[in-house]
From Swiss-Prot:
EC number of this enzyme: 3.5.2.5
Pathway per the UniProt entry: Nitrogen metabolism; (S)-allantoin degradation; allantoate from (S)-allantoin: step 1/1
Organism: Salmonella paratyphi B (strain ATCC BAA-1250 / SPB7)
Family membership: Belongs to the metallo-dependent hydrolases superfamily. Allantoinase family.
GO BP: allantoin catabolic process; purine nucleobase catabolic process
The name this protein goes by in its record: Allantoinase
Organism classification: Bacteria, Pseudomonadati, Pseudomonadota, Gammaproteobacteria, Enterobacterales
HAMAP family per UniProt: Hydantoinase (MF_01645)
This protein's encoding gene: allB
Metal-binding as UniProt keyword: yes
Keyword Hydrolase attributed: yes
Length: 453
C-alpha cells in the first residue's frame, strides 16, 4: 500500500511506551504504526529524534478581536506551531468583546479566518451578566466554560470579561452540568487578594516578593476548596486552572479520591521559575497566581511526577510592552509562553529529572484532549489526526527575542539555555513548521466544535 507520508526511525511516544517505529499517514490521519509499512509519496527520516503527539495547549489568550495589538491569531498560532503546539484551546477573555454569547463567538470565528496555523477549540465565558445565554455557546460548540472567582476585567469597558460571585458560579455551574459541560475556574480569593494588593501599594511594597506575598497560597487553596464544593453541589464537572501550589493540588486530589469529577492543570513557569528569578526578570514574569518560592516549586514537581496534575498548559497571556512598564504591583499580569512550553518542559522534566516519554506525552497532549473531548487529537494511534512534533534531544540553544513569533517579541524565557529543540511540527499530515524552512504552507488550521467532530 502507498501512503501520503511515512515517518521513519523516530522514537515515537505512544500511550504506554516509547520506541523506534514508523508512522504512516493517509488523508491527514495516522493510518498505521509499525515496521516495513510500504511506500509513500513523502518520507521523513526522524533518526535520533523524539516524535511526540502535538501539544494540546488547553489555556491560551490570543486577544483577537478587539485587542489584536496584544496578540493575534496570525502571530500567536505561528508561535504555537514553532513551539510544537498543534491544537490550542482559546480562552473567552482578553479579546473585546469577551466571548459570552452567540454573537461574540461568531466574531472570534470571523477574526480567525485564514490566520490559523494550528487547530483551535474555543471556550465560552461564564460571567456575571450572561447566565441566561450560556446555552448559546453550548449550541455553537464550545468545549468548556471559563470563569474567575478572582477579580478580573476592566470595569470601565462594558463588554470586558467579569468575575462571578458564589451565587453566579453556583447557578452557572448548575446550567453547565445540565449541558454536560465543564466549568474551568481561576481560583484565588478575590477580596483577600485585592485588599492585600492595595495594602502593599499604600505601604510602598512593590517588589516581586511583595507581589507574591499579596497572593499567598491560602488564597488559592481556599478558592479551590470553595469551587470544588459548589461545583459538586451544582452537579458540574470542574477543571481547576493554572494551579501554582502543591497545597492546591492536594485539594483536587482529595476531591478526586472522594469521587468528584475534577481535573487540574499547571504551567511551565511554576516549575522552572521561582520568586528570586521573578525578581530578577521583572514584570515579564508577573502572572496570577504568582510564581512562588523554591520550596513550593519542589512540591509542584513532586505532584507532577505523582500524576496528580492532569496537564500542562501555557496560559499564554501577552500584552503590549507599555503595560509591563512601572513596578511589579502596577504592571499587567500575564506571561508570554506558548512557544516554549514543549522544549522547556522536555528539557526540565524528561532530560533533567527523568520523566518517562509516555508521561510527557500525556501531560502535553493526551490528557488535555481527553478532558475537553477532542476526539481526534492528543495521541499517536491509528485513526487519530496526524498531529506530530519532532523534538531534538540534547540540543542546547539560548532563546533570543528574535526567535519569538509573538506580536511583541518578549518572554521571561529570553536568555534561557534550553536543552532541546522543536525541529518540525505536523498538523493533519502537513509540515506547518520546520526549523530550517520556517512555515512552508499557508495557514490550514480550523476550529474544532464540540458537536461536529
Amino acid at each position: 500500500m502507498s501512503f501520503d507520508l511515512i515517518i521513519k526511525n523516530g522514537t515515537v511516544i505512544l500511550e504506554n511506551e516509547a520506541r523506534v517505529i514508523d508512522i504512516a499517514v493517509q488523508g491527514g490521519k495516522i493510518a498505521a504504526i509499525g515496521e516495513n509499512l510500504g511506500e509513500a509519496k513523502n518520507v521523513l527520516d526522524a533518526t535520533g529524534l523524539i516524535v511526540s503527539p502535538g501539544m494540546v495547549d488547553a489555556h491560551t489568550h490570543i486577544s483577537e478581536p478587539g485587542r489584536t495589538h496584544w496578540e493575534g491569531y496570525e502571530t500567536g498560532t505561528r508561535a504555537a506551531a514553532k513551539g510544537g503546539i498543534t491544537t490550542m484551546i482559546e480562552m473567552p477573555l482578553n479579546q473585546l468583546p469577551a466571548t459570552v454569547d452567540r454573537e461574540t463567538i461568531e466574531l472570534k470565528f470571523d477574526a480567525a479566518k485564514g490566520k490559523l496555523t494550528i487547530d483551535a477549540a474555543q471556550l465560552g465565558g461564564l460571567v456575571s451578566y450572561n447566565l441566561d445565554r450560556l446555552h448559546e455557546l453550548d449550541e455553537v460548540g464550545v468545549v468548556g466554560f471559563k470563569c474567575f472567582v478572582a477579580t478580573c476585567g476592566d470595569r470601565g469597558i462594558d463588554n470586558d470579561f467579569r468575575d462571578v460571585n458564589d451565587w453566579q458560579f453556583y447557578k452557572g455551574a448548575q446550567k453547565l452540568g445540565e449541558m454536560d459541560q465543564t466549568v474551568l475556574v481561576h481560583c484565588e480569593n478575590a477580596l483577600i487578594c485585592d485588599e492585600l494588593g492595595e495594602e502593599a501599594k499604600r505601604e510602598g511594597r512593590v517588589t516581586a516578593h511583595d507581589y507574591v506575598a499579596s497572593r499567598p497560597v491560602f488564597t488559592e487553596v481556599e478558592a479551590i476548596r470553595r469551587v470544588l464544593y459548589l461545583a459538586k453541589a451544582a452537579g458540574c464537572r470542574l477543571h481547576v486552572c493554572h494551579i501554582s501550589s502543591p497545597e492546591g493540588v492536594e485539594e483536587v486530589t482529595r476531591a478526586r479520591q472522594e469521587g468528584q469529577d475534577v481535573t487540574c492543570e499547571s504551567c511551565p513557569h511554576y516549575f522552572v521559575l521561582d520568586t528570586d528569578q521573578f525578581e530578577e526578570i521583572g514584570t515579564l514574569a508577573k502572572c496570577s497566581p504568582p510564581i512562588r518560592d523554591q520550596e513550593n516549586q519542589k512540591g509542584m514537581w513532586e505532584k507532577l511526577f505523582n500524576g496528580e496534575i492532569d496537564c500542562l498548559v501555557s496560559d499564554h497571556s501577552p500584552c503590549p510592552p507599555e503595560m509591563k512598564a512601572g513596578n511589579i504591583m502596577q504592571a499587567w499580569g500575564g506571561i508570554a509562553g506558548l512557544q516554549n512550553c514543549m522544549d522547556v518542559m522536555f528539557d526540565e522534566a524528561v532530560q533533567k529529572r527523568g520523566m518517562s516519554l509516555p508521561m510527557f506525552g500525556k501531560l502535553m497532549a493526551t490528557n488535555a484532549a481527553d478532558i475537553f473531548g477532542l476526539k481526534h487529537k492528543g495521541r499517536i494511534a491509528p485513526g487519530k489526526e496526524a498531529d506530530l512534533v519532532f523534538i531534538q534531544p540534547d540540543s542546547s540553544y539560548v532563546l533570543k527575542n528574535e526567535d519569538l513569533e509573538y506580536r511583541h517579541k518578549v518572554s521571561p524565557y529570553v536568555g534561557r539555555t534550553i536543552g532541546a529543540r522543536i525541529t518540525k511540527t505536523i498538523l493533519r499530515g502537513d509540515v506547518i513548521y520546520d526549523i530550517e524552512h520556517g512555515f512552508p504552507v499557508p495557514p490550514k488550521g480550523q476550529f474544532i466544535l464540540k458537536h461536529q467532530q
